[in-house]
């Protein structure tokens, strides 16, 4: 059973290992998991994941792999060997790519990370999709990619909370991971399709990714406790 008692994932979106660990040391692994993204992972290499795991955190490795099937599957395998709790790939890589990742993880005898698909980035709106040749609403593209993810045997999806109700209705077995979460009164920053933590959970999200409202707070531990209180109502 997970040591974490909440659905919260704090994004360690920092340029250096020291800055990320400084924040992590102010957080309680029982109250949140942590997310390691491209900037931190690239600047710190794989050691950051092992260090966070040693501190008691479950780690979401948010690298959004997208490549040919074998290359992506090997990257997912490497992530699993690091001990990550969750890893993601772009659904737009296609059915064969996602299936290859699922099949590679199935070969493992030890713990398997949750394999999550990225649908449409929360910063993208219809005009952004049109710019890459997809003249559809984000919600339509999300549902298309979700169907592929379900067929490939993925564990869940990264999606906006605004898409969560439709996704839960269409694919109730998929776990939904929602970025762009902002507690009431927070700035939107560069996330467009957002909801508050309580709204996101009520909409069907299973895990909530929160970054700047906690990482840039004067007292991150206090900010985290406030979000926990908000979702527990």
Curated annotation (Swiss-Prot):
Substrate binds at residues 13, 35, 62-71, 122, 182, 191, 211-212. The keyword Lyase applies. Keywords: Decarboxylase, Lyase, Pyrimidine biosynthesis. Belongs to the OMP decarboxylase family. Type 1 subfamily. NCBIfam families: PRK00230.1, pyrF. This is Orotidine 5'-phosphate decarboxylase. InterPro entries: Aldolase_TIM, OMPdecase, OMPdecase_AS, OMPdecase_bac, OMPdeCOase_dom, RibuloseP-bd_barrel. It catalyses: orotidine 5'-phosphate + H(+) = UMP + CO2. GO terms for molecular function: orotidine-5'-phosphate decarboxylase activity. Pathway: Pyrimidine metabolism; UMP biosynthesis via de novo pathway; UMP from orotate: step 2/2. One of its GO terms (cellular component) is cytosol. GO terms for biological process: 'de novo' pyrimidine nucleobase biosynthetic process; 'de novo' UMP biosynthetic process. Its EC number is 4.1.1.23. It comes from Pseudomonas entomophila (strain L48). Pfam families: OMPdecase (PF00215).
